[in-house]
Every structure is written in structure tokens, then in C-alpha cells.
Regions:
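Catalytic nucleophile-elbow at a beta strand-turn-alpha helix junction centered on a G-D-S/GDSL motif
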Residues: 83-101, 156
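Alpha-helical cap/lid subdomain in secreted, periplasmic
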Residues: 2-14, 102, 106, 110, ...
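N-terminal secretory targeting modules
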Residues: 1-87, 109-115, 141-142, 186, ...
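Conserved donor-binding loops in enzymes that form glycosidic bonds
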Residues: 91, 124, 258
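Short beta->alpha junction loops
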Residues: 120-128
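Short glycine-centered, acidic/aromatic-flanked micro-motifs in structured strand/loop junctions
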Residues: 89-91, 121, 151
Length: 280
């Protein structure tokens, strides 16, 4: 089904954030909405309206989760020290304007506003483990206390025929994941949290992609999830195959079968908080 111009704009703004790239330029720390709106071919008022709607949905998810006294206690027990920096790394699942990390941001704002915990969303749509490795040292310079990694979905993307080369080979994905871990241990005091890429609904993925567009198979995503489990070792591991189910619950994924819906992002945030809060 063809999208309306408004729906296309909202999707573009949901998964693309040019301010992350612009912030790396000299004097680019504060990027005004007046500069960002033209990137999407819209006016400032519409840009702010859509941006605010994403934030409100993430805030609403956080408040709904906090209606559970048990869950609220897990948020209180999250091992993030006051004033610390928590970095979330990954692809569009993290870069999503209403992602698990944005929900986590609102959870902390609701329950622990005085702690001054900084959450840095360093997800980049379309990223792979190779791309993440290329920018990882710059992220370590932010001196994070915690690094949460959810990466690998795009590594196994291929164009229609599964015999074609995936974006990143399994061997390279494994090496990249291990290098991320080794660099963290050697150059940082940060604690690592690993999340497996979630499963997809293959039928939806096939239906929503054209002949020349990348596609995905659950068998390949399962292999990456296995690699993440192997690399995690004694670090905290959040297994999203357990959180989503195998096969995944349909409402947790968008019609494209790959990206988490708002309910899916909420499930990721809940699994992360429960795992970290329980381990403490």
C-alpha cells in the first residue's frame, strides 16, 4: 500500500536523525530545529509536531510500564550511578525516535530525575557491526559507564537470493562483536550489556520488500543471536528471542516484519530493565 506524504515524512523522521552526524562537526553540538526541518522537506512547526508525538508515545509507554509496582522497583534498582553516562548502540531498532532507549530515558526521568543520568542514543539506521566498529573509539571517548549494544540485524541482510553475499559474513560479525568487547575491556571502565537482534516475521518481510531491496531470514538472525550469546560471557545478556517469542508475537513487529512496533520497543525496554534490575 502506498503511503501518504505525511506517513512518509513521519517514517523518515522516525528512523533518520541528521543531528547525530552534524553534531560531529565543529560547532555542531547544538543543532536547531530550524536547521533540521529542511532535511525532511518540511517546516519547523510540522517537524516539532511529529518529533513531539514520538516523544509523547515513548513517555506514555514508560508510564504504562510504571503502573506495575514490581517493574517500578526494577527501575529504581537499575545499576546506573548518579551522573553517569549510558550509551545505546545499534541500528534502526535503537535509532527509532520511540525506541527502547527513548522509553528507558522516560522511565529514568519519571522515577529517578534527581540522578542526572545521561542517555546517549548512538543508534544509526542501517548500521552493521562493521559500521559500529568504525565509530566505536569515538564513542568510548564519551567515557560511558554503561554500553548497551543491540546490533547485527543488518549484517545478515541479502538481496532476494540467500545464496548472495550478506552485508557482513558470519565470521566477520563474530570478529566485530569480539573486538567491540575487547576494546571496551582494554580502553574503558564501562560495563557492557548485550541484546540479541529480535526475530522477524519472514512472510511480512518478503511481502514488504521489492526484488532489488534487501531481505532477511530468521535462520540468519538466529545465527547472529547465537554469536551475541557467545560473546556476552559474564556480561548482562538480554535475549530478545525470549522476549519476542519464536515465532514472534505479531503485534511486536511493524507490517514490514522486521522493525519493532511501539509494543515491540516497549517489550525490549521491559526485558532490559527486568534483566538489569534483577541482576543487581
Amino acid at each position: 500500500m502506498e503511503q501518504s506524504p505525511r506517513a512518509e515524512l513521519e517514517e523518515s523522521m522516525q528512523y533518520h536523525h541528521p543531528e547525530k552526524t552534524l553534531a560531529e562537526l565543529p560547532g555542531g553540538q547544538e543543532i536547531a530545529d530550524e536547521m533540521l526541518a529542511p532535511f525532511f522537506g518540511t517546516d519547523v512547526r510540522t517537524y516539532r509536531e511529529i518529533k513531539g508525538a514520538f516523544a509523547e508515545r515513548a513517555r506514555r509507554c514508560a508510564r504504562e510500564l510504571l503502573e506495575s509496582v514490581r517493574f517500578a522497583r526494577f527501575v529504581d534498582r537499575l545499576p546506573f550511578e548518579p551522573g553517569s553516562t549510558v550509551v545505546g548502540l545499534g541500528d534502526s531498532i535503537t535509532d527509532d525516535a520511540q525506541s527502547w532507549l527513548e522509553i528507558l530515558r522516560h522511565l529514568l526521568a519519571e522515577r529517578r530525575p534527581e540522578d542526572g543520568i545521561e542517555l546517549l542514543n548512538a543508534g544509526i539506521s542501517g548500521d552493521t557491526t562493521s559500521g559500529l566498529l568504525g565509530r566505536f573509539l569515538d564513542l568510548l571517548e564519551r567515557d560511558p559507564a554503561w554500553i548497551i549494544i543491540l546490533i547485527g540485524t543488518n549484517d545478515v541482510a541479502f538481496v532476494r537470493d540467500p545464496r548472495t553475499k550478506s552485508l557482513v559474513s558470519r565470521e566477520e560479525t563474530d570478529k566485530n562483536l569480539r573486538t567491540l568487547r575487547d576494546l571496551t575491556e582494554a580502553l574503558s571502565e564501562a560495563r557492557l550489556v548485550w541484546m540479541t537482534p529480535p526475530p522477524a516475521i519472514e512472510a511480512r518481510v518478503v511481502e514488504s520488500s521489492s526484488l532489488c531491496e534487501p531481505t532477511w531470514r530468521n535462520a540468519d538472525l538466529a545465527e547472529v543471536a547465537k554469536l551475541v550469546r557467545g560473546v556476552a560471557g559474564e556480561d548482562t545478556l538480554v535475549d530478545l528471542w525470549e522476549a519476542f517469542g519464536d515465532p514472534p508475537e505479531p503485534e511486536l513487529l511493524l507490517p514490514d516484519g522486521l522493525h519493532p512496533s511501539l509494543a515491540g520497543q516497549r517489550a525490549i525496554a521491559a526485558a532490559l530493565v527486568e534483566q538489569l534490575g534483577y541482576r543487581r
